[in-house]
A protein has these predicted regions:
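Glycine-rich phosphate-binding loop of ATP-dependent small-molecule kinases
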Residues: 1-217
Length: 217
């Protein structure tokens, strides 16, 4: 499977890419678990350059090595609940601040109002939020996709009990932050129930629309 995680692709092909050289332009990428945020983000970065920082991947990588947050993060992952905001921000802050080449796709953040308020406090002066890509599928469709993924990946958070808790958390915590984001930013919705080859062109259109709205293309 084609995957790029928390990686920057440097492209100085034209003025579009050079215009980002010293700026932190961030595009939030949200959606329920299994909605395709990561795969679409990887392919957008491959097409347009920039960076993809996946909060979920950072957390999964963090628990592989013993450290001060390992047990706590693993517990939240096993239970399908959100890691405390201050921990998540500590883990992603440097990656976001050091990613100044192109648009940074921040995958899986902010997930709740605590995330968003902390973002505004810590990153608000140094990052320019362009908008949000919102990936959408029915929960029934996502449940089947995640169960199938769990058989291949062995991920602890891809079993039915945890999946349902993750959906509940997304439905009850992320809706509020999406309403808040809509007050300030453009949110482009992409349905990812069709096969990737059919859905990805809509990702490209949504991405380009937000970039153009910000005068960057």
């Amino acid at each position: 499977m084609f995957r790029l995680k928390s990686v920057c692709v440097s492209r100085n092909v034209n003025a579009f890419y050079r215009s980002f050289a010293s700026r932190n332009n961030v595009l939030f990428v949200l959606g329920a678990p299994g909605s395709g945020k990561g795969k679409h983000s990887d392919h957008l970065v491959a097409k347009f350059g920039g960076c993809h920082v996946s909060v979920g991947e950072i957390l999964r990588e963090t628990v592989k090595t013993p450290g001060k947050y390992t047990e706590m993060i693993q517990k939240h992952m096993n239970e399908g609940t959100l890691v405390p905001t201050e921990v998540t921000m500590e883990l992603i802050r440097d990656k976001v601040m050091n990613s100044t080449n192109g648009v940074l796709l921040l995958d899986g953040y902010p997930r709740n109002m605590s995330n968003y308020k902390t973002w505004c406090d810590v990153m608000g002066d140094s990052c320019n939020v362009l908008g949000c890509l919102l990936y959408k599928c029915s929960y029934e469709f996502l449940e089947k996709r995640l169960i199938a993924r769990g058989k291949d990946s062995g991920r602890a958070d891809d079993n039915l009990e945890v999946i349902k808790r993750r959906f509940y958390s997304y439905e009850h915590e992320t809706k509020e932050v999406l309403d808040k984001l809509r007050e300030k930013y453009s949110i482009e919705e992409i349905c990812t129930e069709p096969p990737f080859e059919e859905a990805f062109p809509n990702s490209v259109k949504a991405y380009c629309k937000i970039i153009k709205q910000n005068g960057l293309m």
